[in-house]
Amino acid sequence: MKASQFFISTLKEAPADAEVVSHKLMTRAGMIKKLGAGIYSLMPMGLRVVRKVEQIVREEMNRAGAVELVMPVVQPAELWQETGRFESNGPELLRIKDRHGRDFVVQPTSEEVVTDIARQEIKSYKQLPKNLYQIQTKFRDERRPRFGLMRGREFIMKDAYSFDRDQASAKASYQVMAAAYRRIFDRFGLTYRAVAADSGAIGGDLSEEFQVIAATGEDAIVYCPGSDYAANMEKAEALAPSGPRAAPKQAFAKTATPGKSTCADVAELLQVPLQHTVKSLVLATDTLNKEGAIVKTQIWLLLLRGDHDMNEVKVGKLPGLAAFRFATVPEIEAHFGCQPGYLGPMGLRQPVQLVVDREVALMSDWICGANEPDFHITGVNWGRDLPEPALVADLRNVVAGDASPDGQGVLAIERGIEIGHVFYLGTKYSQAMNATFLDVNGKPQFMEMGCYGIGITRLPAAAIEQNHDERGIIWPDALAPFTVVLCPISPERFPDVKAASDKLYAELLAAGVDVILDDRGERPGAMFADWELIGVPHRVTIGDRGLKAGEVEYQHRRDSAATTVGVTAIFSLLQAKLKA
């Protein structure tokens, strides 16, 4: 490709709404162009990167035995109603009507459609296993689309779906796909972690996220440096506390804490460690009638240590708390006789369901709210001042330094960007949609399923967050829009420069190298700045002075300076670099 034929559109400044590095650099490098909130055109330079991603993903999916198809972007609501997701999914699911008033959805995933295909086409155990995948446009109506391709509303995703005859073979299919994901991300040259994850709205009971390590990542990744343990924050656990509770040493006392409504403020006032305080979080669950009206509300009080944060996913998995919400101020006042900030488990006006974090269950002489403004209770002890807690659970997010649940050290936390996710679904969708096959005994069985996603358009953005400097993007070879750029200096003035550039360009093309020749006639400084911003890994500069000495200049995008190379050696050098 010659630059004069290509579409190159770089900017000196990023748009004001670009927050993260990848959004700024992809916009400045002319890879994406914003059309609307969370909706971007993939410009030619950006599309080349996306096609590289698709190619490697497609190769590894095919290698893993998956078969490609394409399913519709717009899908009938009836299929989604079979699984209940048409009603249960929030506003992120874009619902539309056609001219006849029929309901449709714009696909965020395609479990329903692929299960419908399977139930129509797969009749016997002899047809299993099967693995189908697509690389297709998706849409999620994000409330706050941001960060460019990192969290857009329209995006491209690879989604695969496996069908097996039993649980054992389904989990084997899961492992085949997880291994394929590792090969994919290894080929991209990214630093990543595979971490245990919660299955969330997709369903199932076995799940891993693939996270690119980046300081700007939205997700917290928890891992143990001394073992293989790794999980996202939603799933991560610390080693369960053990040992006898310390004997009480303090008297139960109502203590004035004027204007101190947070655990941190109370700890500072009383000059005690924050971990001696206990915070009270009030939740509510509603029972609805057939019309959707609330007929009963249960109030819950959760007790956590003052320096810990509630893990909403863990709490939502507790019996009775699947659909919890935070209680309103009137609900809190009706049960506690006090506004938030001074709440505690004693002296309630109405009973609540108490749930105690397992750390709090082992505490002695702790501090909590007195259910009276400007007062807290100090010296609180289980068994003496309160009955022993009946419901104890892990309610919190882990923190760095917690003991690893495998007993192999302490936990550390780093930031990451999710680029892939694998799920073992079991029979959640096949049961809901009656997708059965006849087993070896001629009896109908529900198909065991898995689903596997990769964010095709998110992956380049994640790669940039991990690979950039003050000059621009630094693409790994496998992702670069072009792997080599040739920069002739004033070829219109020096025929030997043009001839040498054309010769090397032709040799590289013949060798199958993804090369671009910059024949735009730009000044050297502007030309170099463009390619450093765009992030092409290998640059060769060809100038008249160097040619007279039989030399050209080679510079890798990560190098701070160029290296002189003999004209006759540059082709071999590039071949060696590209094979490394």
From Swiss-Prot:
It holds the Pfam family tRNA-synt_2b. Belongs to the class-II aminoacyl-tRNA synthetase family. ProS type 1 subfamily. It comes from the Bacteria. Its EC number is 6.1.1.15. Catalyzes the attachment of proline to tRNA(Pro) in a two-step reaction: proline is first activated by ATP to form Pro-AMP and then transferred to the acceptor end of tRNA(Pro). As ProRS can inadvertently accommodate and process non-cognate amino acids such as alanine and cysteine, to avoid such errors it has two additional distinct editing activities against alanine. One activity is designated as 'pretransfer' editing and involves the tRNA(Pro)-independent hydrolysis of activated Ala-AMP. It is found in: Cytoplasm. Gene3D superfamilies: Anticodon-binding domain, Bira Bifunctional Protein, Domain 2, YbaK/aminoacyl-tRNA synthetase-associated domain. It comes from Albidiferax ferrireducens (strain ATCC BAA-621 / DSM 15236 / T118). Its main location: cytoplasm. Keywords: Aminoacyl-tRNA synthetase, ATP-binding, Cytoplasm, Ligase, Nucleotide-binding, Protein biosynthesis. It catalyses: tRNA(Pro) + L-proline + ATP = L-prolyl-tRNA(Pro) + AMP + diphosphate. GO terms for cellular component: cytosol. One of its GO terms (biological process) is prolyl-tRNA aminoacylation. Consists of three domains: the N-terminal catalytic domain, the editing domain and the C-terminal anticodon-binding domain. It is an enzyme of class 6 (ligase). This is Proline--tRNA ligase. Homodimer. One of its GO terms (molecular function) is proline-tRNA ligase activity.
